[in-house]
């Protein structure tokens, strides 16, 4: 499932530029919020919805992408927001930061050389495709009346690497996703034995 985090930034209406947005929010204050989340949650991959270059069409959107890039670096730098390190978090370097490009209206930022993933998989446990789950989620957007039709089948998303190493074959290239990462070899062995002996019948 997903976990949602909040900063002290809030939607104050249409903003013409990221500079206006960051001035209103307090650039360093909000950057520290994003930095804290990265250090606490420790993501391996960070994906932004909007670019830093303005195609998102809204100051808040562009500012969020700028903050993501700055926090990607700051979270790994012990000289940035050092007071956080006394509150139970440590520095953290995510493997990569990507921008999920889009083709919306008259703006197409997708390119053939960008990394592609198919988000249209089906979850047999939930009995729904990820497109259906996403549609249900968007229908809960309270302030702007969003909503999209549920869909099944292939949904290709394009991702442009902004910082860190670019993925070649998988979004989690060079990331340890095994149980060994939990730091408990016995746990990994136990899980492997359970999987080996599991009989659905």
Task: Provide a role label for each language-model segment.
Residues 74-201:
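The feature marks non-catalytic terminal segments
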Residues 1-81, 103:
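Active-site beta-strand->loop->alpha-helix modules in alpha/beta enzyme cores, enriched
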């Amino acid at each position: 499932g997903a976990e949602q985090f909040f900063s002290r930034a809030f939607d104050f209406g249409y903003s013409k530029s990221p500079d206006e947005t960051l001035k209103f929010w307090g650039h360093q204050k909000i950057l520290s919020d994003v930095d804290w989340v990265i250090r606490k949650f420790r993501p391996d991959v960070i994906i932004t919805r909007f670019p830093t270059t303005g195609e998102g069409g809204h100051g808040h959107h562009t500012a969020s992408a700028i903050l993501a890039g700055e926090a990607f670096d700051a979270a790994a730098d012990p000289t940035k927001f050092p007071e956080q390190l006394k509150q139970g978090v440590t520095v953290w370097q995510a493997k990569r930061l990507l921008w999920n490009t889009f083709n919306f209206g008259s703006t197409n930022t997708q390119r053939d050389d960008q990394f592609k993933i198919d988000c249209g998989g089906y979850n047999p446990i939930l009995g729904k495709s990820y497109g259906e789950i996403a549609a249900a989620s968007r229908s809960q957007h309270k302030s702007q009346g969003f909503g999209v039709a549920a869909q099944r089948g292939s949904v290709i998303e394009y991702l442009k690497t902004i910082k860190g190493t670019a993925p070649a074959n998988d979004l989690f290239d060079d990331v340890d996703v095994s149980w060994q990462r939990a730091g408990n070899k016995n746990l990994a062995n136990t899980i492997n034995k359970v999987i080996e002996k599991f009989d659905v019948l």
